[in-house]
Each structure stands twice: as C-alpha cells, then as structure tokens.
C-alpha cells in the first residue's frame, strides 16, 4: 500500500507499507529515513471529507481511517511542541523549524513588530546565509509575504548583518527560541461553534484550553486543573469545568463532523497527558471502541479478542518519558555528545571554523571521544541519584509499604501514591544512601 507523505517544506516522500499496516508503521518508516529517533513528537495528518484537519491514529489501521483507496496522502507534522533545549537531535530540530516557519508565513503565530523583524532576518539567514546586498530585499519580501516599508526593511537589514557567520542550524535554533516564548506556541486550534451557534476557535496547548474569537482575540482561558472531564457525543464535545465558586459548568462545543469532534476530544486528553502527567495511564492507553463484527465476536468468542478493536488515543509517552527514551536510544547508538544547546555558544559558520579545533588541550592524555563517553557516564550516574519528581534534590526517602526509593523528602511528602507502582503511600521513611554524591567525590573531567 502506497502513502504519499508531505514534509513541512513541501517535499513529498513515497512510503510503501503493508495493506493492514497501522499509522505507526508509516510514521516510523518516515522518521527512519529522516534519521529521527524522537518519533513521539510527530504525527501524520490528513484532510477529512469536510476539509477538517485530522490526526491519523497511529495504533489503528491506515485504510480504516482514510477515505477512498490508496495511495493515501498524509502530512508529517509536529504534534507535541517542546522547548528547543529539550530537542536532542539536529534532524528533529530542523523539522520543528520547518513547521514553525510554515506557521509563521501562514499567519498562524502572532508576533510583535520587533519579533517579526528579528525572525525575518533569521529566516533569511537560514535560507540564503550571510547578508547580500543584491538579494536582501527580495529575500525579506518573499519570507514576509508582504510589501515592506523602508524603515522596517532597514531594521531587518541591520539585524541580518549582525548574523554574519551564523550557521543555518544555529539560526534555526534561534528562531525556535523566539517562537517558543510566544503565547500561542504549541497550541493546536480547532474551529467550533458554541451552544448559541457562534463561531469560535478552541486552542489546546500545554497549559490549558484557550477559547478565542475567529480573529484569535481571547475570550476565556481554562487551566487543566479546573477541567473535571471531557466527553464526546457525535459532533459535540462537552467540557465540565469547575468555577471559582466551586460549582461546575458544562461547556458545549459543536464541530463540523463526528471525526472533528473526536479530534478535539483526543487533543484535550492527549495534550494533558503529554505535558502534565508523569506517565500515560492505562485508562488512556487502553480506551477503545469496536465495530459491529468485533462487538459480536467479543460477546460470543472471547472478550479480549482484537477483532474490530479501534483505539481512541495513540499517545505512548509523556514529554519527560520521550526525552529520557531519546537520550537512552541515542546513547546506545553511540551518540554521546548530548549537551544541551542552551549550554553551548552558537556554532559559527563552517567557513570560519578552524582545523585546530580538532585538538583539545583539556583532555589530559585522553581522546576527546573517551572524555565525552566518561562525561556522559558521569552525568547518567548523577542523574540516577536525583529525585524523579523534581530532578533537583537527591533521593533520600522510601515509600512504605511498597519500598520504592525514587524521591527526595520534600516531594515524597506531597505524594499520596507511589509514582512507580501507583500503590497507596502509608508513610515515608527517610533513608541514608551510601551513594551520596558528596561521598563519591564526583567531578567532571
């Protein structure tokens, strides 16, 4: 079965999968060809029969979700946006940048005039390199998609000149840094109508749910802690919210189709799980529905039969779990230099690099590769001794009666259930581990 997958830069990829393949099979093949290990940040989108943008459920068959016959047309998109310094791979960062660039040019991200000037210069640097008087004005107008005033153009030119020697990768990273500070970063928008038929936009993001008018002017913002429940029935999505008075109110959102309503319901549940939870619960992972054939088979044959089973959600890991999983995968693959980009100075232009940078006087007899391996082992050792909740203080408390020792005293006192086995905590016992870092005298080479 053939699938055409379009990247954010409009490059088309042909992907051949089995006729009964799930969406995950297609996404994994795309990411493998792009050299991306951080697959969990991405998803595949397609357009429904009524023009709505829908996420392919990666755990279900492709052919059962798409209209018509193969070849199917899909779009590779970032589903979960994270801070730039949490992205470990250059390839992943590049796809993030392409998606952000597409959103900027389409006007989906609102930025201030100062940010627009800086972003225009950075986008020109990523596409054309250092400032060139012969192509500068054309470049800026092409990127901004509008006529520029002379004062704005001069400001962009000045900014672009300051970027001389900055590599494409560094410029892309700076774009991500600027955009990640914007209010609407990482928000997925859905077109809805309220109970009175008024057109609205619902934004589902890391911090909560935004309700806006069609011009993105805000009406209300709902934080996740006050959301009691989200449910879907047909084309409608119901959101039960706790008011400041303590009473509950049910908000109704009407969608253009049942699949669009399912998409909003999925977005609320999966986004909350990804950004706000320690792990994806089994209640989310195992929620499914059955078609008629599968329902009959479960009644008369076996309740656990997979026939006709369609999973509601496809999220597998939270943001923290994705980061940890990617670090382990990259380390096992031999990629050990995973220092955060925020801790490095921006890489210079390849034309200005020097061959002398290959030698290092601080390694004291060890090769740079050996030094990096030891530094990574040391980092993992220190990290293993940190509280899994705050990742700042050292582990010094045991949960009873389960016996898991994974948190510091302050975090353990706030937990009612063990974050590892989910069993109820009756009391917390302070412990003195012989692996305290001060006793080990750990220092970086």
UniProtKB/Swiss-Prot annotation:
Homodimer. Interacts with the E2 ubiquitin-conjugating enzyme, UBE2D1 (via RING-type zinc finger). Interacts with myosin regulatory light chain (MRLC) and TMEM4. InterPro entries: Band_41_domain, Ez/rad/moesin-like, FERM/acyl-CoA-bd_prot_sf, FERM_2, FERM_central, FERM_domain, FERM_N, FERM_PH-like_C. Residues 1-279 form the FERM domain. Residues 431-433 are annotated as: Critical for homodimerization. Residues 342-363 have a biased composition (Low complexity). This is E3 ubiquitin-protein ligase MYLIP. It comes from the Eukaryota. It is a peripheral membrane protein. Keywords: Cell membrane, Cytoplasm, Iron, Membrane, Metal-binding, Transferase, Ubl conjugation, Ubl conjugation pathway, Zinc, Zinc-finger. Can bind 1 iron ion per dimer. Iron binding seems to decrease LDLR degradation activity. E3 ubiquitin-protein ligase that mediates ubiquitination and subsequent proteasomal degradation of myosin regulatory light chain (MRLC), LDLR, VLDLR and LRP8. Activity depends on E2 enzymes of the UBE2D family. Proteasomal degradation of MRLC leads to inhibit neurite outgrowth in presence of NGF by counteracting the stabilization of MRLC by saposin-like protein (CNPY2/MSAP) and reducing CNPY2-stimulated neurite outgrowth. Acts as a sterol-dependent inhibitor of cellular cholesterol uptake by mediating ubiquitination and subsequent degradation of LDLR. Coiled coil: none annotated. It comes from Mus musculus (Mouse). Residues 340-363 are annotated as: Disordered. Its EC number is 2.3.2.27. A zinc finger (RING-type) spans 387-422. One of its GO terms (biological process) is cholesterol homeostasis. The gene is Mylip. It is found in: Cytoplasm; Cell membrane.
